Amino acid sequence: MKSAPFVSPNFLERVAEPGSPFHRDYLAYQRREITRAELIRQLPHVAMLGDSVCMGIHISSPWSTFWRAHTCRGKNWFLHRDAPRETCSIAKTLESITPLVAIECAGVGALVDHEYSRQDLFRRILGTRNFSAQVSDLLRAFRLPDLILIAIGHNNVDWAWRCPPNDFVEPHERLKRLSEDLRQNYRRDLRRLLERARTQQRRVAIVIYGLINFGSYFKGREAAEHLRESDTTLYPRLEMTYKYFISFHPTYRRNLIRLASMVNKKLHAMVEELNREFVHQTEHIQLRYSDALATADLGRAELLHPIDGWHASVEGHNVLANAAVSDLAPSLEFLGIGDSHRPKPR
């Protein structure tokens, strides 16, 4: 499912201020030298590519889950339209600095995939767009975003799914193979973004977030499981997790944590490799690996959704947003988004 770009509602009021970096563009718009769409293109564009970790989703009945998967845009830690006060998304934080255009590309159940691999029936029903499709969406857009945030790969660490019996006994080689497959597929599509960025006449910053801290996360999950043991009305869909993500079963968690750690090392090395190939030769591209999500403390039950005890609660979304934003300063500085973009006090 594709999403429409979100434009800061008060952008015209803000760019009309004489101190705005976009005031000259606003005057051109007032003189009808450029259109409203052309004015919007001058604003910083921020995109989020990712999976369910980036989305406001939880599992319940099949029909409700299907409906939610198709309506959950703009209800997460990247972008929350009409957000309640207790929810502070990345887009909302950046809006305090500058009016912007936010583009949410993440997909429920999304995988780091091979471009020509066939999706399973469940993901086709949900309208899932895997990493290759999300990248293709950005490349087809009229304008490549200035800041591209990527947090994907969590669905690729379900190592027990379709696992041969022998690999349950000795899983190390399987974990190595899965982490390497993810790296190769990730690298292929990231290179497509970098190739496009190299042709741009302006700066582009890309942040690759490592997978979340599963060791900490499972402490929160265990706390939720203990609460459900004492009160079965809590987390009513908690056991459904195992139907969709086999490796969340307690028996398989240790190796899931191992695999996620291996993936993060691969992603870090991949970024260093691509920096040598692209960034060191092209001054207007910045590519960074961030461990902000990989080190965030997710070890509390209240960070999990009260229905499935799997996806993030409102408080969980805030923790993820705060972690992700905490490591954006180098990218914002590279793009020139900072004090000069802050609205003047009234």
Model feature map: region roles:
Residues 62-188:
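Conserved SGNH/GDSL esterase-like catalytic core that processes O-acyl groups on lipids
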Residues 45-57, 101-106, 146-151, 156-158, ...:
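Structural recognition of the beta-strand scaffold that forms the well-ordered cores
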Residues 49-63, 157-159, 210-234:
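Short, solvent-exposed beta-strand-terminating loops
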Residues 99, 199-204:
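A short helix->loop->beta-strand "cap" motif at the edges of active sites that frequently abuts
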